[in-house]
Amino acid sequence: MIDPLASPGSAPLIVIAGPTASGKSALALRVARRFNGVVINADSMQVYRDLRILSARPSVEDEAAAPHALYGVLDGAEVCSVGRWLALADGAVAAARAAGRLPILCGGTGLYLKAALEGLASVPEVAPEVRAEARELLAALGPAALHAKLAELDRAMAERLRPSDAQRIARAYEVVRGTGRSLMDWWSDPVATPALPGRPLLLVIDPPRAAQRAACDARLLAMVAAGALDELALLLARRLDPALPVMRAVGVPELARTLRGEVGLAEAVERAQGATRRYAKRQGTWIRTQLRPDRVLSESLVTQLSESQLTDIDNFLYAFLLTGAS
């Protein structure tokens, strides 16, 4: 069905987006098996080898059922910026097409998805000493205080960021200090890195709130049962910089407290469940307001869709692949 000789600009690209625990991976796997596809990760935590369980990466069985790419490819000591991910994704899409397979992006990291569909503005390299200053201030003062400093230099950007969002606060601070321009100004410049080549079809999963919250709670319990605490103990033993993305993944700070003996397991799990629900809510809001889907699946979680509903999705995709109509 996928012509490896087709022009990259006209070749189909399926994008499946949605909040955590909504069933994205299950749908992507189904599409990959039915349409000879490769599932390509668009989740900023699932790129790390250290977090198979806590990032809800596809299981070994799922990875054996269909090809997957960009899952567990980076060490936790690294940072996977949007630009770096976009370059990796571009290579993965090209490799899928060269093999005659359908590339299927799957994830909930909004900035990754937006870059894939719209491209990425160019932000110049910040001088190492300015970057070091931002990291030192973050370590010494904490994210909330650095957020206040950012507001003095770039109020508009500060208003977009939560005071606890350490990584993005430090990035915004170093850009405005190093370039004299807000990161928002750089984003508004003409695109320097193009979107992923192809004819995209965007499916968004937007399940009912109650079902989403229940799925988040159940997933966290399943992670703990599957060995999340053992996985986390290995990560903490590495003594990585607490500001690294892998150390701030949803569930990591909350469950780490029980490993340090600060709270009991039940309280840590409850806190991690709450963090997961809040994260899913933010993801859903961002996706609804920032992306332009070709189809929204809002009836239920993917895992609760009937076979007839799933078949309808298959037919929708089949029509797109044959004609380009959505």
From Swiss-Prot:
Its EC number is 2.5.1.75. The record marks T109, R131 as: Interaction with substrate tRNA. Residues 43-46, 167-171 are annotated as: Interaction with substrate tRNA. It is an enzyme of class 2 (transferase). GO terms for molecular function: ATP binding; tRNA dimethylallyltransferase activity. Its cofactor is Mg(2+). It holds the Pfam family IPPT. InterPro entries: Dimethylallyltransferase (IPR039657), IPT (IPR018022), P-loop_NTPase (IPR027417). Keywords: ATP-binding, Magnesium, Nucleotide-binding, Transferase, tRNA processing. It catalyses: adenosine(37) in tRNA + dimethylallyl diphosphate = N(6)-dimethylallyladenosine(37) in tRNA + diphosphate. The keyword Membrane does not apply. Signal peptide: none annotated. Substrate binds at T20, A21, S22, G23, K24, S25. GO terms for biological process: tRNA modification. Belongs to the IPP transferase family. Monomer. Catalyzes the transfer of a dimethylallyl group onto the adenine at position 37 in tRNAs that read codons beginning with uridine, leading to the formation of N6-(dimethylallyl)adenosine (i(6)A). This is tRNA dimethylallyltransferase. It comes from Rhodospirillum rubrum (strain ATCC 11170 / ATH 1.1.1 / DSM 467 / LMG 4362 / NCIMB 8255 / S1). The gene is miaA.
